Amino acid sequence: TDEYKHKLDEATAAAAINELGLPLDFQTATKKVKESYATYRDGLEIFAREYGIPHKDLYISYHNYKKKLVSTIKPYDGLLEKLQTINCPQYVFSTSSKDICEQILKHIGLYDFFKGRFYSVEDFNVYKKNESSEVYQKVCEQINTKPEDCIFIDDSYSNLDFAKQIGMGTIRIYYKNNSTKDMKFIDKAYKGIYECIDGLKKDYGC
């Protein structure tokens, strides 16, 4: 949700100041995170470019703070039951650490549901987000499925671009207004997870 995204921005800013020792106040650091997303599609990238911090160090410090947010996530009522009605195998691919992602999946009651789970760092040694489409190709190879037979779903449009580059179908979930109407690498956009599930059935026959 937008509220959770705001918390992630603040966690990124706090990590930059408290763990990496950057000479910034909290407001300035948070502003830089938002600027980084807008410019590089990655909230950490600006700190790598302006302060020379390795992406691995940025990744680790950010996830140290992200751990504190897991308990604040509110599970969607009946989401597991809704996902079980989709007639196709479903996988998780995340740029978050395996530890945090699995904590989140357990917290929201979906840990045992997905057919497989893949993590950009632990499985593919990729610390920097949105650098190439290679990691998406590797996920398709792992599940032995052609990209054109996959649908990649995300609420972050920046993750959808590279998925589309290798031929995957792409769906964006948004929460308030669809701000990506003119982005050609997004096939469909649905408001919220429930509308997305309904759309998968209606528009894709899942």
Model-derived segments and their meaning:
Residues 57-64, 68-71, 79-108, 118-121:
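Substrate-recognition element of Asp-dependent hydrolases with the DxDx(T/V) motif
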Residues 147-190:
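Acidic, Mg2+-coordinating phosphoryl-transfer loop and its flanking beta/alpha structural elements
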Residues 91, 97-151:
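Substrate-recognition "cap/lid" segment bordering the active-site pocket of phosphatases
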Residues 119, 187-199:
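Short acidic-hydrophobic, aromatic-tinged amphipathic segments that line or gate anion-handling sites
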